[in-house]
A protein has these predicted regions:
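Conserved ATP-dependent adenylate/AMP-binding module captured primarily in the ANL superfamily
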Residues: 124-159, 251-268
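Conserved AMP-binding/adenylate-forming core of the ANL superfamily
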Residues: 38-40, 49, 57-102, 106-110, ...
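A short N-terminal helical cap/helix-turn-helix that marks the beginning
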Residues: 5-20, 37-60, 75
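A short helix-loop-beta submotif of the ANL/AMP-binding
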Residues: 81, 94, 100-128, 136-142, ...
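Conserved adenylate-forming
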Residues: 84-90, 209-224, 228-268
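ANL superfamily adenylate-forming
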Residues: 155-222
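Short, contiguous pre-domain boundary segments
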Residues: 24-35
Length: 268
């Protein structure tokens, strides 16, 4: 595998001015918060990559007491991206991510974005029929989920276009003391997946990227589709909501603009 080389990334800006014909009485109550912003005209992956290059040693997230820096996070994202390309994922393909708030969910979300695929985000506790509907609506070709949810996906697999099921495990991302406690409590309740099950275990999946010697990153636009989320279905059948790169990136910039006291390294 070729060693990656990086050059300083220049991200263009994009604005969405408020038309003069639109009445905005609430602007008078915003204080010092700007009414409009200059948004980064890039993908979700490019935004995270730029931050990781700028603050490599800063803590990106804390999971059950285990710290991960931006550099470590970006390394894992790129590793996943190469592995996705190795198993044949192409630009525009849908990848269903059915994970709780865990490190693998972060890695897979941004890896999916890096290669130009679309992340279909669903709740892992959804019922089988709901999962089947989400997979059919999105036409997903890959599912990433935890070991304890495997049986639900295998039960409806033949009714979908799923080619690969990638299995992650919570225990793999825990520190040693926490892992020991987890395996003595929640971990022991998980039904083992049969050794001959048609799945790709996370550790095996991570190693597949070593075979990727070509450019795995795909250049996309800020307003291209990036993520699919689902409505609650309170007024009818649940619907897939397609969000763009800039939908996510804008939210992060709006949070910072609304909280000017935030500084690199602060926790939220």
């Amino acid at each position: 595998m070729k060693k990656e080389t990086f050059k300083e990334q220049v991200i263009e800006k994009i604005t969405f001015p408020v038309p003069e014909t639109v009445k905005t009485p609430w602007f008078a109550h915003r204080g010092s918060i700007p009414a409009t912003l200059e948004y980064d005209d890039c993908t979700m992956y490019e935004k995270v990559e730029a931050i990781a290059r700028k603050y490599p040693g800063n803590i990106a997230f804390d999971f059950m007491g285990k710290h991960t820096t931006y550099k470590q996070m970006l390394d894992q994202i790129n590793k996943c991206a190469r592995s996705l390309k190795t198993i044949g994922i192409r630009e525009g393909d849908k990848i269903t991510i059915a994970l709780p708030n865990c490190p693998q969910a972060i890695y897979m979300l941004y890896a999916t974005n890096a290669i130009g695929a679309i992340a279909n985000m669903i709740h892992p506790l959804s019922a089988e029929k709901e999962i089947e509907l989400y997979l059919q609506m999105s036409e997903s070709v890959v599912v990433v989920t935890l070991d304890q949810f495997y049986n639900k996906f295998e039960a409806i697999r033949e009714n979908t276009k799923i080619v690969n099921i990638i299995i992650a495990r919570i225990k793999d991302e825990l520190s040693k003391p926490i892992k020991t406690g987890y395996m003595l409590t929640e971990g022991r309740k998980i039904t083992p997946i049969p050794k001959d099950a048609p799945v790709i275990q996370w550790d095996q999946f991570s190693k597949l990227g070593k075979a990727c010697s070509w450019n795995y990153k795909v250049k996309r636009k800020s307003q291209d589709p990036a993520v699919i989320l689902y409505s609650g279905g309170t007024t009818g059948k649940t619907k897939g909501i397609v969000l763009s790169n800039i939908n996510f990136n804008a939210l992060s910039q709006q949070v910072i603009a609304a909280n000017p006291m935030f500084r690199p390294g602060d926790k939220m």
